[in-house]
Swiss-Prot record:
This is Acetylglutamate kinase. Pathway: Amino-acid biosynthesis; L-arginine biosynthesis; N(2)-acetyl-L-ornithine from L-glutamate: step 2/4. The gene is argB. Substrate binds at residues 69-70, 91, 196. One of its GO terms (molecular function) is ATP binding. It is an enzyme of class 2 (transferase).
């Protein structure tokens, strides 16, 4: 890494002046941030992210962090000789895999991120959706068309869940009390079965239940791109649905945008898809006039 360029005192003052109205806008508001993608594997970016989260809390914003862990799960499964299979973009999770998923998400990744935030001066509390029955889920299913028979088939994803209910009792004990919840996307069924939940979907459900001011989805891409691969800075829900229908939004971006739409329908005021590999992406989005990524709104 190269050293960051020097910023003059005058430029520093201008940056702070520009940030002030945004800090006032988000004062005592809840911001849910989904932290994921390959940026999680870069220690410098992870520690910079942790410092940014502490800064939000210090400026009277209530951050709630949801993290993913796909690459780390894949690495551990490979190390243990367990083959990863996917369908419709979701990891097929059998009994052996769910144990590894829970170990990596709720153990390794969650506690590492909690450690980084605490090291930066915050008071992070590591949890997963199972704690306090925070997130209840039902078994997720997907359908795919068989390429030979052209018949639609139901795909059994194993222990993969869709959020059904979010109980805010535990989160409300933390939010606004100088504590930063850091959530691993695991949930339980009514019978006590552990489910692996897509981190974007999990974050959308939590943000919707909290009626958050903003939901930020950190990804490996700059945001939603048009057909010429240029960033679309802003989209209405209507426009987003149109771009899904005409194929502009495709592949793995579709479930992300669908999560955004769901969160907005549940009362979140705005959702932004941003590039987690950009240093201080969260601060750029919240505290600068131009923002970053793609803002989706009603």
């Amino acid at each position: 890494m190269t050293d960051a360029p020097e910023i003059s005192p005058l430029d520093q003052a201008r940056i702070l002046s520009e940030a002030l109205p945004h800090m006032q806008e988000y004062d005592e508001e809840t911001i849910v941030i989904k932290y994921g993608g390959h940026a999680m594997g870069a220690e410098d970016l992870a520690k910079a992210f942790a410092r940014d989260i502490v800064l939000l809390e210090q400026t009277a914003i209530n951050p709630v962090v949801v993290h993913g862990g796909g690459p780390q799960i894949a690495t551990m499964l490979k190390r243990l000789g367990i083959k990863s299979e996917f369908a419709a973009g979701l990891r097929i999770t059998d009994a052996a895999t769910i144990e590894i998923v829970e170990m990596v998400l709720a153990g390794s990744i969650n506690k590492q991120l909690v450690g980084y935030i605490n090291e930066a001066g915050g008071k992070a509390v590591g949890l997963c959706g199972k704690d306090g029955n925070m997130v209840s889920a039902t078994k997720a299913t997907r359908t795919m068309v068989d390429p030979d028979s052209r018949i639609e088939e139901v795909i059994d994803l194993g222990f993969v869940g869709e959020p059904e209910k979010v109980d805010l009792t535990l989160l409300n004990q933390l939010i606004g009390h100088e504590l930063i919840p850091v959530l691993a996307p695991l949930a339980t069924s009514s019978s006590g079965q552990t489910f692996n939940v897509n981190a974007d979907t999990f974050a959308g459900a939590v943000a919707g239940a909290l009626k958050a001011k903003r939901l930020l989805l950190l990804t490996d891409v700059p945001g939603v791109l048009d057909k010429s691969k240029k960033l679309i800075p802003e989209l209405s829900v209507k426009d987003a649905r149109r771009l899904i229908a005409d194929g502009t939004i495709s592949g793995g971006m579709i479930p992300k945008v669908e999560t955004c739409i769901y969160a907005l329908e549940q009362g979140v005021q705005g959702v932004v898809i941003i590039d987690g590999k950009t240093p201080h992406a969260v601060l750029l989005e919240l505290f600068t006039n131009q923002g970053t990524g793609t803002l989706i709104h009603k």
